[in-house]
């Protein structure tokens, strides 16, 4: 009996030790529990309002076969097929309706048509134009603003001038956000052959070269997101150079494909010993371009290192969801509530790189735009409290 006891006692101790080790090393499985956030498939009508600046500085883009005309025509036509109504306007100090329909858009893009419109073509205040456009943007409409976005620097204190314009733009969009909290803004930088007069505060000179111009898309982020899912930026003929967008925080529509029971799923172990989960998400309302959405560095866990986005996969254009996020959760993670936030950099570096502060010597600044960073930073300041563009909420459980 004593010999049996000597054998049994060590075996019991060994079993206890093994169980203890398994428990302490977090050998339990990781589950995720969630409540799906549904995609809002709205059938509400969308009205597209296109505003083309017709100040004198825009004439140089209007030559036959210019990239400007090709790009505007291709993008407006593609969007027109996805909206219910499209309205065309010229804009300078006043807003004038086009005397042509979409089919004849290219014919209307010429200096002669521009000159027939009301308002002053001799000077342009982009901040005022943006204010007029934003005030006319409704919950069911998307406004497209096409302009060279040059701020006409007066003689004197240019720094103060730019600061005033930036403040004016911030005020415009801050007031609009108070009224329309879902307002979003996309700014696309493009380039085109330019052949015409370049205007300074005093005088002008002829140039023939590639020059930048901009397309702004302003409207309810849900509508902008819907249009982006149907009409990609790659639709624009000759492509685009740069992009930046601003939006309020979105509780991202998401789901997980399969589960053991309702809204709960066990993760699969990867080679690193982490439990992984694939989340189907619709990131369209963030308005960010694909490179930003595909960077896992822009996704942040609220609980720290134990949870991370290890991969991002895009879904084909036109699908209900836009991306698949792969989440990796360490096996020793304790049960908790978790939030994944999408927090990309607020301002891309290109905004400073393409800006000109002088308003002089265009031949040394052919690829730059006078004052553009102050317009864009004016918009950015209106959205400064929205550091997270999207959130995904769920719970981590284990057995």
What kind of region is each of these model predictions?
Residues 4-49, 56-61, 390, 394-399:
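Acidic, polar low-complexity linker/tail segments
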Residues 41-147, 151-152, 185-187:
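Von Willebrand factor
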Residues 64-75, 114-131, 157-177:
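Well-ordered, non-membrane alpha-helical segments in soluble/globular domains
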Residues 150-210:
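VWA/integrin I-like adhesion module and closely mimicked acidic/polar interface patches used
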Residues 207-229:
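Conserved beta strand-loop-helix elements of the APE1-like EEP
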Residues 223-271:
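Short, compositionally biased P/S/T/A/G/V-rich stretches that sit at domain boundaries
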Residues 254-399:
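Extended non-globular C-terminal regions
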